[in-house]
Amino acid sequence: MTISILGAGAWGTAIAISLSDKQDVILWTRNKTTFESINRTRESDKLLGCRISDSVSVKLAIGEVVNASTIIIAVPTQSLRQVCQQLHDCGLKKDIAIILACKGIERSTLKLPSEIVNEVLPNNQVAIFSGPSFAIEVAKKLPYSMVLACQNSALGSKLISELQQENIKLYFSRDIIGVQICAALKNVFAIACGIILSKKLGCNAHAALTTNSINEVKALYLAKTGNANIDTLLGPACLGDLVMTCTSLNSRNLSFGFKIGSSNDSFDVQQILSEGKSVTEGFSTAQSAFNLAEKLKIKMPICEAVYRLLYESVSIEDTISALVN
């Protein structure tokens, strides 16, 4: 059995390292420099010190990944549609399941990752792999828990058996939409928390902001589905991921917010983004979430405050006022 992982960023590479003890793995990258570097050093510059096993075969041509038993996609959400189209054009077989390990909302369509796949690859079943998991800790094989969300219970059981490792606790869910909403929004909330932390506004403000974040998840969740599953909200995919991402500077999104808050309105968003080794999904998701809230006619004040700071040049002082009030 072979699993193909599309995307050799920190997260995709960490998954490849984690799974390579149990089975053969193909790791696909569209970046020639990354391809050559990993093949030469058996290490990623995004996960220094974590060796990539020889059982991980790194490929540059996407046509070499389509014959795996399962495909995991770990590319940025804004690139997902293009990658799915490439898989379609390569003749991906309909019996190959796709596991999505990307978090966000497509800016141009306001669609979740599973909705994108359903449009481009309608014959392939989709599952979501999400939860509190820093890539570096996964690559070091430290313990963690995740949710595997899939509407087909039999397929879900099969995929869990493929992904199961000694250091991971996997929970099954049928709530594909809820899990994705949580996964996307928590990155925006982490940016907000980074700003609050940078200004040393205290644990009380930080805790209040994190708590209010769950209310915004619930608001979008209800608007999209008409129902908010309490098990999803209180499980690893929502509460667990939110707590981790909104409290640790190991979070790219929280670190991004912290740098902005420390800059006293003199920040250059693109420069801060370019300083990171990996994609800061919350930047794109802030815009998508704001536009989706407008479309659905719901209030999401934290997402709105982050959006207006990043895209409309609202001051940090006014942003903080909106966040704490």
PLM regions with names:
Residues 6, 10, 14, 33, ...:
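Conserved active-site and cofactor/substrate-binding residues in soluble primary-metabolism enzymes
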